[in-house]
């Protein structure tokens, strides 16, 4: 619950459904005694992959199952010959804080406290650990998702530049009904030290704890607790009178 709350706050409202994310997180900790592993406890030579969800969380026909998540890892290993030694989430967000939890739990590998991004983001390049700046880096991305009964189930493996592979994965999400699970961008753990949001998951959990603690008194107190913890301030408050939610082009 704390991870879902804190992820939603740090994600800036992005990163998918906190309810769905918490369900996957609960499944992960039920399967094994999953623990969050600090980056400095990981061998620098360990190959780490990123787990993410790509697409439009508000799409009506979206569907990704736990089996789809595990199939992504299977396809990745089949294509690259690499068995990941650790996994990180691509970002903090309502649902995305939990990316990689189930895979780590079922594979028995570390869930590393070093998300690619401390907040939610819309494009694959934004969560690429600066790898898109290296013209020599060739990535492999695998993605799976979509309902079989609707004829939308897809499985893809793409290799190439991060920019072009990200666009292909986004296109796959559209064909799958709006969302796919993804495994991508293998790097050594040493690379994460300067290129990831080290400690981002534990920060989300503590943010959620402080917010939850404040909510026991009032919503206002919950917000104030978060402001004090993160060093923020309240700029405005009031009711939301109107908003627009649009799913288009896999976003």
Show where each model-derived region lies.
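Extended, polar beta-sheet/loop recognition surfaces of beta-rich domains
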Residues: 13
């Amino acid at each position: 619950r704390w991870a879902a709350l804190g992820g939603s706050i740090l994600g800036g409202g992005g990163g998918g459904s906190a309810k769905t994310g918490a369900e996957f997180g609960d499944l992960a900790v039920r399967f094994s005694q999953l623990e969050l592993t600090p980056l400095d406890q990981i061998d620098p030579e360990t190959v780490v992959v990123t787990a993410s969800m790509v697409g439009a969380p508000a799409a009506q026909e979206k569907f990704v199952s736990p089996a789809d998540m595990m199939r992504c890892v299977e396809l990745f290993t089949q294509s690259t010959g690499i068995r990941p030694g650790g996994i990180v989430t691509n970002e903090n967000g309502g649902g995305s804080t939990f990316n990689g939890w189930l895979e780590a739990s079922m594979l028995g590998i570390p869930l590393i406290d070093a998300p690619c991004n401390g907040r939610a983001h819309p494009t694959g390049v934004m969560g690429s650990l600066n790898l898109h700046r290296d013209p020599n880096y060739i990535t492999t991305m695998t993605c799976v998702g979509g309902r079989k009964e609707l004829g939308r189930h897809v499985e893809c493996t793409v290799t190439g530049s991060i920019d072009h592979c990200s666009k292909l994965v986004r296109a796959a999400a559209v064909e799958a009904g709006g969302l796919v699970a993804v495994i991508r961008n293998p790097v050594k753990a040493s690379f994460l030290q300067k290129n990831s949001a080290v400690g981002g998951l534990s920060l989300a959990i503590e943010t959620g704890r402080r917010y939850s603690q404040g909510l026991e008194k009032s919503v206002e107190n919950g917000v104030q607790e978060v402001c004090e913890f993160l060093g923020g301030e309240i700029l405005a408050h009031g009711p939301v009178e109107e908003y627009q939610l649009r799913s288009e082009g896999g976003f």
